[in-house]
């Protein structure tokens, strides 16, 4: 009661924000007359003046009134569209890093130009994020005229569809016309598109480009700039609906099967070393599960590889271009010598199954990494499986939080305001409509069966068509829209079907969905982003007249459109029919929001049945008993506010369930995200630094100190030293042949510290000899290439290990441990081990690699680039719905569901890793 009293006196927070912004609107309006008096060149010159003021120390906030006034004047002149006052408020909300909820038809695309122009003045770039490629192209070409008039450049990023990253990026150029191309969008490189002041693109492409940039081997291969400001259109769809699944770039792990088979034929020809310093090609360290080639073995292996055509004449195993061969040889040696059939693994049904060394049980679904599993498959003659390995991954939550400033706009965000605030720190501000909303949202009609419901929908469509009222029927799945389409065909009712597949065709159909008597079936996302204009799209009709239409033709088209527009208005505007409730109230509101744009009349109604998924799972028993008590007959419907409220409560449960899934995903991904930031920052510094020799020198000392300490513990006496072991590992791992035992015999006063320093000195001298041979410049290139290769290789393996850890961590709940805490602890330990391995392997490779000429450095670089771009796959799965299975692709045959994991009992720990019982967590539903 106190809260409502305070709200009556002071207004809600939303009202106070809108009222405060209204004062700035008045200041913008005061500038209008002055700007209208300027010619086009003088208006354009204002952009340069504003940039100078910003560079001189003025804030964006101080420039906002003039920048918004300039944008509005450009819109009026170039496009005949003057921003309304409420649109100015929407622009200010975007600039302040909030979400603007604006009803459908209120001109969100135009609103974005205000905040985009202001923030582009800094020269750091603005990203406008859309839900599909077509909308990115359409909006860039449409609004590009406005930006171009103000001297700003506009880029577009589209999906390349596997044709190379530079094959689908454009710059707005009013002088560009191409046969079969997109009007005024000139193809350019991706980097040029990102260098534009404002860049339009989809959330997937912005995310994938970020990941690709962090896999680049040269600075010039990176395309994005610093992530400055993003305006996310349809922000609820992108930051909520699509945020349940991460973006993943994957590729085949390891080489093709042929390489493993060829190595498999080489290894049996090598002989073991029976005793230390004795003859033989390799020595075995069973304790560490490692195999080392002797000098004789290295020469023999090189000759066998030359005979097999794997090595060129004069090329060595430790040459810069042969690192991949060395990796394969090591895997094959371990497979043949250290891993034994029926001890370490079983061969069953053409597969290698790992045996747990502690329990003796088969570890189903597990595979060894680093090419070992494939090497064992080659050894046993079973089919060699090319694994898909995650090369890079990020969730939308963590990608969009990288922007210095983030904002968004949508017609429906208020129901998810809590999540936007919790996850992204974004406040939702509801913007008032320019004209009062007059749409009639009618009560839901609930039927006993789906058959009765669909009959009622067809009857309603017939009624609307007879009175020439346009109808949009929303469905929750492709299956439902196709079923309804079949019923309409039987009833001989002409209609269009949209299934969110062909975005460009959809937009054209949706433009005409407001014609008198038009019937359109659409899934919830189909055609989103395109307004349904009553009477049809006048702009689309005028476009058919060509570039220089006759005035008489233009007048005729306008008169015809006005006649249709008035007819639809008289018949009640657009009527929305919902064929079932969606799992989220927000999606239902999106459907309703298609009608009643800009004060137009319109109506909406949902038709439900007790057999609908939402009703069946959550509300059917109570509603069914009520309907039976009322003595409902077949074909009769119940229309009651209590039923509508019960359905909304069910939707709230599903929304809470989906929020938990997203929050849970984020809590786990935050752990990986902290590590990702460290690795990507390290990688970026590597690319930007010309000379990393000092860093590598410090790393080499650090690694050698660790190795020496394993065999000569600090503060120990000489009798405790393992000199043969140290000598062996320095030679095998680092190529350092040192007579440490001889030094100790000859020099009685050789202390531990002096010995350590001498080893470091010999390592530095050996490295300097290598550098003198090829030159400092070539060595610097080799250092960067090796560092990048090792970093990337280990990071990929680390991602796979993190995936395995994540999959099994929920089981820790059985041991009364908090799975999330366990995951954080183990992930941190794994990351520390990763950094140690990277340092060791970089040092070992650089000490052993044989570089003869600058051409070797180029060969290593070419090998890296080829490996990096080979067979990449870009994946962003659609999140699974609680109520609907994902839509099957065309031509796919439905497969029966087979449970791969045991069913979760109500008293078992929840699968999500929260540590709660299933019935108290996600089992509550």
Swiss-Prot record:
Q: Where is the composition biased (Basic and acidic residues)?
A: 895-906
Under the heading SMART domains, the entry gives: SecA_DEAD (SM00957), SecA_PP_bind (SM00958)
Q: How does it sit in the membrane?
A: Peripheral membrane protein
Provide the catalytic activity annotation.
ATP + H2O + cellular proteinSide 1 = ADP + phosphate + cellular proteinSide 2
Return the CDD domains for the record: DEXDc_SecA, SF2_C_secA
Region entry Disordered, spans: 867-909
Tell me the compartments it is located in.
Cell inner membrane; Cytoplasm
Enumerate the UniProt keywords alphabetically.
ATP-binding, Cell inner membrane, Cell membrane, Cytoplasm, Membrane, Metal-binding, Nucleotide-binding, Protein transport, Translocase, Translocation, Transport, Zinc
Example of a GO MF term: metal ion binding
Gene Ontology CC: cell envelope Sec protein transport complex; cytosol; plasma membrane
Q: Does the record's keyword annotation contain NADP?
A: no
Q: Which Pfam families match?
A: P-loop_SecA (PF21090), SEC-C (PF02810), SecA_DEAD (PF07517), SecA_PP_bind (PF01043), SecA_SW (PF07516)
List the EC numbers from the record. Answer: 7.4.2.8
Tell me the superkingdom of the source.
Answer: Bacteria
The record's cofactor note says: May bind 1 zinc ion per subunit.
According to its UniProt entry, one GO biological process term is: protein targeting
**Residues the entry annotates as binding ATP:** 87, 105-109, 531
Q: Which cofactor does it need?
A: Zn(2+)
| Principal subcellular localisation of the protein | membrane
Which SUPFAM superfamilies does the record match to this protein? Answer: Helical scaffold and wing domains of SecA, P-loop containing nucleoside triphosphate hydrolases, Pre-protein crosslinking domain of SecA
Q: What does this protein do?
A: Part of the Sec protein translocase complex. Interacts with the SecYEG preprotein conducting channel. Has a central role in coupling the hydrolysis of ATP to the transfer of proteins into and across the cell membrane, serving both as a receptor for the preprotein-SecB complex and as an ATP-driven molecular motor driving the stepwise translocation of polypeptide chains across the membrane.
State the similarity comment: Belongs to the SecA family.
Subunit note = Monomer and homodimer. Part of the essential Sec protein translocation apparatus which comprises SecA, SecYEG and auxiliary proteins SecDF-YajC and YidC.
**Descriptive protein name:** Protein translocase subunit SecA
Gene assigned in the entry: secA
């Amino acid at each position: 009661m106190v809260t409502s009293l305070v709200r009556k006196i002071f207004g809600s927070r939303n009202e106070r924000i809108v009222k405060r912004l209204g004062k700035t609107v008045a200041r913008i309006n005061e500038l209008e007359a002055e700007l209208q008096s300027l010619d086009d060149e003088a208006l354009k010159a204002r952009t340069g003046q504003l940039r100078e003021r910003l560079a001189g120390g003025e804030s964006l906030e101080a420039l906002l009134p003039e920048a918004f006034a300039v944008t509005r004047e450009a819109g009026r002149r170039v496009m005949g569209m003057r921003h309304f006052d409420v649109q100015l408020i929407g622009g200010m909300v975007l600039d302040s890093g909030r979400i603007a909820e604006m009803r459908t038809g209120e001109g969100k695309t135009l609103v974005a130009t205000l905040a985009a122009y202001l923030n582009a003045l800094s020269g750091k770039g603005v990203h406008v994020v859309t839900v599909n490629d077509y909308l990115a192209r359409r909006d860039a070409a449409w609004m590009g005229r406005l930006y171009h008039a103000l001297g700003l450049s506009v880029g577009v990023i589209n999906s390349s569809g596997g044709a190379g990253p530079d094959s689908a990026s454009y710059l707005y150029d009013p002088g560009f016309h191409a046969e079969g191309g997109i009007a005024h969008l000139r193809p350019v490189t991706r980097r040029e598109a990102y260098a534009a002041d404002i860049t339009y693109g989809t959330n997937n492409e912005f995310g994938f480009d970020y990941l690709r940039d962090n896999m680049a081997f040269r600075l010039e291969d990176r395309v994005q700039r610093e992530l400055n400001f993003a305006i996310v259109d349809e922000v609820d769809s992108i930051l909520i609906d699509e945020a349940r699944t991460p973006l993943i770039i994957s590729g085949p792990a390891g080489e093709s099967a042929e390489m493993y088979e060829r190595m498999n034929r080489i290894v049996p020809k090598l002989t073991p070393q029976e005793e230390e310093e004795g003859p033989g090609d390799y020595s075995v360290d069973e304790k560490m599960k490692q195999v080392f080639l002797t000098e004789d073995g290295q020469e023999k292996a090189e000759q066998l590889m030359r005979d097999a055509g794997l090595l060129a004449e004069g090329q060595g195993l430790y040459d810069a271009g042969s690192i991949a061969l060395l990796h394969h040889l090591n895997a094959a040696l371990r497979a043949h010598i250290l891993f034994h059939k029926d001890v370490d693994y079983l061969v069953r049904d053409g597969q290698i199954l790992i045996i747990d060394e502690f329990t003796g049980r088969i570890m189903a679904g597990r595979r060894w990494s680093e090419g070992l599993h494939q090497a064992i498959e080659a050894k046993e003659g079973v089919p060699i499986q090319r694994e898909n390995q995650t090369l890079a991954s990020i969730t939308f939550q963590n990608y969009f939080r990288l922007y210095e400033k983030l904002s968004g706009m949508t017609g429906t965000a208020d129901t998810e305001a809590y999540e936007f605030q919790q996850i992204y720190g974004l406040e939702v501000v509801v913007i008032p409509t320019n004209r009062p909303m007059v749409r009639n949202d009618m009560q839901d009609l609930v039927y006993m069966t789906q058959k009765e419901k669909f009959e009622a929908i067809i009857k309603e469509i017939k009624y609307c068509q007879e009175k020439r009222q346009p109808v949009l029927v929303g469905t929750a799945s492709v299956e439902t829209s196709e079923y309804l389409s079949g019923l309409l065909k039987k009833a001989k009712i002409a209609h269009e079907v949209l299934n969110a597949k062909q975005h460009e065709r959809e937009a054209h159909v949706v433009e005409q969905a407001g014609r008198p008597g038009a019937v359109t079936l659409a899934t919830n996302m189909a055609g989103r982003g395109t307004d349904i204009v009553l009477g049809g799209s006048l702009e689309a009709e005028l476009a058919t007249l060509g570039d220089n239409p006759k005035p008489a033709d233009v007048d005729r088209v306008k008169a015809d459109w006005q006649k249709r527009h008035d007819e639809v208005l008289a018949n009640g505007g657009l009527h929305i029919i919902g064929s079932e409730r969606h799992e989220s109230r927000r999606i239902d509101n999106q459907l309703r929001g298609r009608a009643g744009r800009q004060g137009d009349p319109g109506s909406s109604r949902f038709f439900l049945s007790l057999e609908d998924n939402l009703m069946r799972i959550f509300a059917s028993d109570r509603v069914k008993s009520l309907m039976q008590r009322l003595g409902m007959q077949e074909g009769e419907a119940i229309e009651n506010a209590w039923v509508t409220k019960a359905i909304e409560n069910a939707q709230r449960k599903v929304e809470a369930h989906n929020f938990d899934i997203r929050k849970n995903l984020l809590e786990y991904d935050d752990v990986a995200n902290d590590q990702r930031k460290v690795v990507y920052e390290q990688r970026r510094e590597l690319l930007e630094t010309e000379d990393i020799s000092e860093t590598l020198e410090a790393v080499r000392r650090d690694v050698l100190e660790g190795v020496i300490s394993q065999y000569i513990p600090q503060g120990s006496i000489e009798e405790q030293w393992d000199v043969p072991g140290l000598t062996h590992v320095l030679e095998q791992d680092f190529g350092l042949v040192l007579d440490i035992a001889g030094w100790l015999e000859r020099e009685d006063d050789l202390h531990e510290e002096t010995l350590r320093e001498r080893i470091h000195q010999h390592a530095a001298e050996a490295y300097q000899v290598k550098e003198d041979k090829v030159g400092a410049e070539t060595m610097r290139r080799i250092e960067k290439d090796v560092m990048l290769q090792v970093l990337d290789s280990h990071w990929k393996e680390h991602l796979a290990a993190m995936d395995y850890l994540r999959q099994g961590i929920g089981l820790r709940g059985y041991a009364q441990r908090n799975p999330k805490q366990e995951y954080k602890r183990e992930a941190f330990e794994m990351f520390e081990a990763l950094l140690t391995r990277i340092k060791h392997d970089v040092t070992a490779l650089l000490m052993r690699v044989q570089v003869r000429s600058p051409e070797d450095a180029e060969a290593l670089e070419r090998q890296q680039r080829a490996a990096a771009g080979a067979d990449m796959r870009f994946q962003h799965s659609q999140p699974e719905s609680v109520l609907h299975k994902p839509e099957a692709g065309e031509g796919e045959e439905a497969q029966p569901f087979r449970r791969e994991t045991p069913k979760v009992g109500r008293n078992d720990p929840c699968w999500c890793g929260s540590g709660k019982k299933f019935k108290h967590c996600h089992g509550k539903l």
